[in-house]
């Protein structure tokens, strides 16, 4: 049975001549906590992006509930990939106010808990009318953690949550 299991088999990824993932096998089960440790440039963020259908792979297979993650609505609803916001980007999401960024995140997660998001916003003392680009690095981390928690996704992946 593959219920709620995110699985990679034979995963390979290269950038030009640099192979960052070689024949990687990985199984992630809901309700468990995993850690991924490696040096800068080792392929951690690349792997997380591939597992969540946000980056392409060269070869191998990634499945959720036994089905490929690409173009899989169940995987999109059930897996939250919350990645580090970049303070240097002043376009895209960083140009949004916190309240609009959270509203857009709610669209992607069918289990989104708006009340919980509001409570976390207050508890983290985040100003909802501030643009993402105006937040400190620590506040940006709080926004990514808030989204991960409020998504209520069975599988939540945090990339550098406290960077």
Where do the protein language model's features map onto the residues?
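Conserved ABC transporter NBD signature motif
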Residues: 52-53, 60-71
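ABC-family P-loop ATPase nucleotide-binding domains
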Residues: 74-77, 83-143
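A short, proline-enriched helix->beta-strand linker immediately N-terminal to the Walker B motif
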Residues: 149-154
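Conserved structural motif at the start of ABC-family nucleotide-binding domains
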Residues: 6, 21-23
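Catalytic Walker B motif of ABC-type/P-loop ATPase nucleotide-binding domains
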Residues: 156-160
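The feature captures the beta-strand-to-loop junction immediately N-terminal to the Walker
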Residues: 34-39
């Amino acid at each position: 049975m593959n219920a709620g299991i995110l699985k990679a088999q034979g995963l390979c990824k290269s950038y030009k001549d640099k192979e960052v993932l070689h024949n990687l096998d990985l199984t992630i089960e809901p309700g468990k906590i995993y850690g991924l440790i490696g040096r800068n440039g080792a392929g951690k963020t690349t792997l997380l992006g591939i597992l969540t259908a946000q980056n392409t792979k060269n070869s191998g297979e990634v499945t959720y509930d036994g089905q490929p993650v690409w173009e899989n609505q169940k995987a999109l609803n059930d897996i939250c990939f919350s990645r580090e916001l970049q303070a240097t980007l002043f376009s895209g999401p960083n140009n949004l106010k916190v309240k609009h960024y959270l509203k857009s995140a709610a669209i992607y997660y069918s289990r989104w808990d708006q009340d919980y998001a509001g409570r976390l916003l207050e508890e983290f003392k985040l100003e909802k009318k501030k643009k993402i680009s105006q937040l400190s690095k620590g506040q940006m981390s709080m926004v990514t953690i808030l989204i991960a928690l409020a998504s209520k996704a069975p599988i939540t992946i945090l990339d550098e949550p406290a960077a």
